[in-house]
Every structure is written in structure tokens, then in C-alpha cells.
Amino acid sequence: MPRSDYLFTSESVSEGHPDKVSDRISDTVVDAYLSAMPEARLGVETLTTTNRVVIAGEVRGPDSVTFKDLEELTREAVRDIGYEQSGFHWKNNDVAIHLHAQSADIAQGVDAAGNKDEGAGDQGIMFGYAADETPALMPAPIFYAHKILKDLADARKAKQGDAAKLGPDAKSQVTVRYANGRPVEVTQIVLSTQHLDESLDSADVRAIVEPYILKALPQGWVNEGTVWHVNPTGKFVIGGPDGDAGLTGRKIIVDTYGGAAPHGGGAFSGKDPTKVDRSAAYAARYLAKNVVAAGLARRATIQLSYAIGVAKPLSIYVDLHGTGTVDEAKLETVLMDALDLSPRGIRTALQLNKPIYARTSAYGHFGREPDADGGFSWEKTDLADKLKSAF
């Protein structure tokens, strides 16, 4: 029987965290190619370190996207994040690009030909999850860990008062107490943020960030018993890739459910939507969210599996964690009928062949508001009525 009274913790990192800088650049490259050719194929990895950005990977796309274009887009991305420090500056960084053609062996397994449908870009397992703990149907700890950092970043960029003294690199961690299976309060808050003014100490930084944190969290969740840890090392001036090297794809739990659900292991950023690591994880979230939105369960975990070159998923698994009102085995069949889970079917249904990925690279791929141009389409609940009517 699942526990109903417990503590659960999730962390988030800001767009200025070195790994997130790398994710942003990789997805900026993806967007550049998809803008020029919606069927472009990419697998792009980025290394960021002191005064240097290295982009490497495989591409099948138009020659109209030049390395000079990508260098300019990289500098724009770093500038938007906010890095203008001596060890990592958008204008002065060395940008090295090492992209080459996609392997023909991989392409032949993925490409549609004759009567063969487009196959998955790789084997793997992907998970989707939803819970009725927040308006976005996300687990509360990761949802609010993201919100804290996003609100602080928005204030920093808008130069709102003393928030302008903060730097781009930051991390948050939120511990939530559950009673009777529902989130009721925050017991621990951890916030480490870079600050540009070297004279600031932990108390000064807390005075800056506390109002934003309190506003981000539900009223009453923070009380006299909540323990705060703000810049516990005391000083955080050197941040971002100048402090630690960053790599694409190293924050996969931050990107998803904060540890509240299983993870198949595949990262998202730098991959075009033929890569099921990305597109099938989005589809699994879409299905799980619509199951919960339809009132069929309070919590839902969905697993999908694929083989390279094979169009249809090898399996689907549903776990409603004892909160469901319907039979899980029947729901598996209903979900397979409700959405074409082939790579092409997912891309078509969710309109994934668009330049919509740079915006996903920080503050979570899930629990976001769908955009008018198709971004975060997997967060829509337009399948809920169809699922409800199947029972």
C-alpha cells in the first residue's frame, strides 16, 4: 500500500546553470535547422566552459544553415541568458562547431520507404507522468522548484530592484510534506544563486530572493517551521560555465518530474522529434496528463518502448497507483487507439516539426502552458473527453 504521509524533495536549476546553457545552445541549433527544413534530423551536443563553447554532432539538413549562422545564434542565446562576465561573455567566447552528416546506417532505419513507415530513431523506454497536485497536473516539488527560479530569472532580466544584483546561475530545492497523499507544506527550501555584487552575504541574498519565493509557493505552505538554506556556502560570484563545465543532457530529472516518476534515461535537448527519446516522452506525458484531466485517475504513469527502425511501440504500460477509476489493462488499449504512437504519428498529432525547442531547455519540459505557435503542445488536455467517453 502506498505511503500517504511523507516528505519528498525535488530540485531545479536555472537557465544559467552550465548544463542548461549547453541544453539551450543545442536546442537553438535544432530550432535553426527545423526553421529551414521541418524534416531535418539532428543529434547535437554542446560543451560549455571558461570562454569556450564547443558544438558537435550529426545533422541532416539544408546547407542554407551555415556555421556562421549557428555561431551568431549561440552568442544570442548566451546573451539572452545574461552572461557578460570575464570568464564567459556572449561577445568574447570562442565558439567551435563540429557538425557532420547523419550516419547512413541510422538514416536507413528511420526513413520511410515503399510500404515501410518511418521507424524510431533508436531503441529505448520512455515514461510520462501526471498528478493532480498542481494546476499543471505536475508533482508539487518540481513544479514549485521550477517556478521559484523562473520568477527570479524574470525579475533579474527585468532589473526589478535588487534582483538585478543576481547572476544567471542558480539552483533551487524544495521539500514538500504530504499528508493523506496530498501536498500540504514546504519544510525545507534551498536556494543557491550567483550574485554579481561580491559584497553580498547570505543574509543579503535571502532578503532579495525571499519575496519571490514566498510569492511562487502556495499561500500557507511556508510557515515558522520551514527551514531556509540560501547560499549556504556564503559566496557565489563565479558562476555558469566559468565555474563548472556544462554538457547537454545532464539534467534529465530536472527536465521531467523531479524524481517523482521513473525515467527511461534518454535526454531531450539537441534531438529532433524523430528521436523517440524526446517525442515519445512528450507523447507519454500527453497521455498521462489527459488521463488525469479526464478524471480517470489522480496519478498516472505511462511507459512506452521502441526499437530502432520499427514504427510502432513494442509495449505500453499504465500504472494508476491505486487512484484510478478504470481498468488499467483496458486503458492501455484505449490509449493505443486514441493516439498513433509511431514516430510520425506523434510528430503529426503534436506538431513537433517546428522550431519550438529552445524554450523547453530550462524550467522543465512539462507543466508548461501551451503556446499559440505549437510550443508545449503535449501539455494540452484536448484528448480528455475522448478518453472519458471510452469508459
Swiss-Prot record:
PANTHER family: S-ADENOSYLMETHIONINE SYNTHETASE (PTHR11964). It comes from Methylorubrum extorquens (strain PA1). Homotetramer; dimer of dimers. Binds 2 divalent ions per subunit. Binds 1 potassium ion per subunit. Transmembrane segments: none annotated. SUPFAM superfamilies: S-adenosylmethionine synthetase. Residues 102-112 are annotated as: Flexible loop. Mg(2+) binds at D19. Its cofactor is Mg(2+); K(+). Residues 1-20 are annotated as: Disordered. It catalyses: L-methionine + ATP + H2O = S-adenosyl-L-methionine + phosphate + diphosphate. Its EC number is 2.5.1.6. This is S-adenosylmethionine synthase. Belongs to the AdoMet synthase family. ATP binds at H17, D169, A170, K171, K235, F236, D244, R250, K251, A267, K271. It comes from the Bacteria. One of its GO terms (biological process) is S-adenosylmethionine biosynthetic process. It is found in: Cytoplasm. L-methionine binds at E58, Q102, D244, K275. Pathway: Amino-acid biosynthesis; S-adenosyl-L-methionine biosynthesis; S-adenosyl-L-methionine from L-methionine: step 1/1. Keywords: ATP-binding, Cytoplasm, Magnesium, Metal-binding, Nucleotide-binding, One-carbon metabolism, Potassium, Transferase. Catalyzes the formation of S-adenosylmethionine (AdoMet) from methionine and ATP. The overall synthetic reaction is composed of two sequential steps, AdoMet formation and the subsequent tripolyphosphate hydrolysis which occurs prior to release of AdoMet from the enzyme.
